[in-house]
């Protein structure tokens, strides 16, 4: 299972050089984990930057993946991740979700660098 972080989603969606580098690491859609926090961040970014229609299309795509809602177990693990790794709340929820589901976290966000179960794809120049 792969949890694709919002940063990786955005790079992939805009077709950046970094997004192109991610393509080989993306599994079939059924093996993507999508926390509801990632859905929130994607909807917010897409609506602001691209438009509501594209946001609706991407959220529909995520719903074919394995959507993981925030529950008490993940919330408590996220609180610990905030403390232990000094992550912001949204990042901690995403990290804790990956850990709870024993998934690899695929990201372009350096906040996750060095954490267990994380594959960091460095941003490439345009």
Kindly label every feature range from the protein language model.
Residues 19, 39, 55-58, 71, ...:
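A general structural signal for well-ordered alpha-helical segments in protein cores
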Residues 95, 99-126:
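Acidic, PIN/NYN-like endoribonuclease modules and their adjacent C-terminal/linker elements
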